[in-house]
Amino acid sequence: MKPYLAVSIQDCGEPLAPINLEGVKLLKPHPYEILGADYQGRSPYVLRTGVLKRLGQARLTLADIEPTWKILVFDAYRPIAVQQFMVDNTFAEIVARDGLQGQSLTTEQRKNIYQQVYQIWAVPSSNPLTPPPHSTGAALDITLLDGSGQPVDMGGEIDELSARSQPNYYQTAQAESDPQREEFKLYQQRRELLNTMMESAGFLRHPGEWWHFSLGDQLWAWQYNQHHPDRQKIAYYGRVE
């Protein structure tokens, strides 16, 4: 079990509300729905009202730094069933990528594949004490749009299963040429901008994903507590249906 799942939850009871903010765009059609995920009539583009308010604050910070840029929301609320769908889908992708036969996987092979899957996907737990971050309505995956409305190149794709997903990958990556070195520097600066604007509103970034931010869930509280051992917090957003 991941350590953040040991954090206690005392849900504050805030409802979910649609993401409808100036300077914040939604990726449509939703990428998981394209893959076949069934949201059963629910929208992935909702957040707890308190989280939504803070996202608006982050957008204002972005406007101060890059006035023409916008936030693009890739994903937000994710029901447990959709979490399970994406875990299964990614498992199948790895099996196909590695040329394996799904019906004849050994126990060790399955274990290895799930280790890769759970690098970017939380376990689709139905236990209310250990909810996936996105099922709380307090986590979202985002990137940036430039002044022409095009996605800003962040040096990696959202949900990418590679070392490039690490937030500070380009800080330590070895460039093979001066132009590539400048390119890596630009990617790192853009990721730092994304983090700066979200942190200014109280969000904290996932340690292994440059695109994932949350506020008030177990992962957020766990990260906060690592840096403030004398001011421990519990999560105030749990699973929401």
Spans of features found by a protein language model:
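Cell-envelope/glycan interface and biosynthesis
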Residues: 2-211, 216-239
